[in-house]
Amino acid sequence: MTNNTIFDDVFRTMVEKMTYLVVPLINEVFHTAYPEDVKIVQLRNEHQLEDGEIITDSCLRIGDMLYHIECQSLDDETMAVRMVEYDFAIALEHRKKVDGRYCVEFPRSCVLYLRSGKRTPDFLEVELILPDSQMCVYRVPTVKVEHYTKDSIFEKKLLMLLPFYIMRYEKSADIIEKDSEKLQRLLSEYEDIRNKLGKEISISGRSELYTDLNRLIIRISDYVFRKKEKVRKGVGEVMGGKVLQLESERLREEGMAIGKAEGKAEGEARLSALINRLFLEGRSDEVQRVMTDVKWRQKLYGEYNL
């Protein structure tokens, strides 16, 4: 898997399979107030132009509004022009004809920057000069993941940013790998993220989201720290990656005839249900033990009839 593909893949997985996570991000960027259960229509991401096909990261409709979000892992200088191109393709595709005249309305768009620096703008801007000399500035807001603390992510329910949170430590990977104190601080931070995520999910009632997001968090962390064994292994264990894998393996070994993928899904759902019950009953301090102690985990499965 290439450098940027893993980030695009994780982003699109959330957009396509956990679409409700996009709502708080849209509210944050465009100052809307959609409820989390608002109806979202996923539109196709392939837009055909005369000179070829354009593929966007996400195109959504809420009510009568179109939204377009691009996920960008690098600060590409051509991004502003590309956004005009993408948005024009989307607008053309959804054009309307009223009283004999076409109306081409551009979508509300933004760019999610997974990495950012001093030169990353708050808005991407392009001057459009029309044949009659009219000039307008096309502005697209940007979202910089690095500007959000873990606390602000949970306060604003921007759970969609969690898998990419680890990328702020990318440049200090060598130091963290060699410094046990810094490594422990990072692991403590991710233990806090895991606990906050569990509490958030126990409130929302979406128990399956716990394992889904954990899996994506681990996936990005594994890639970012692929050459840093201590960090990669530490984050994976804190977020429960080893346990999720063991659960799916155990179910398959018991001879479940539902196939590898379904066995993994059932194991993750079982663990997610147990963790959810612990949070609901105020036993969050037992989650870490559940993640690491097989016998204790089996005992609680029996206690909750899972």
Where do the model's predicted regions map?
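Short, charged alpha-helical interaction segments and adjacent helix-coil junctions
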Residues: 61-73, 173-306
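Conserved single-residue anchors adjacent to enzymatic active/cofactor-binding motifs
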Residues: 1-228
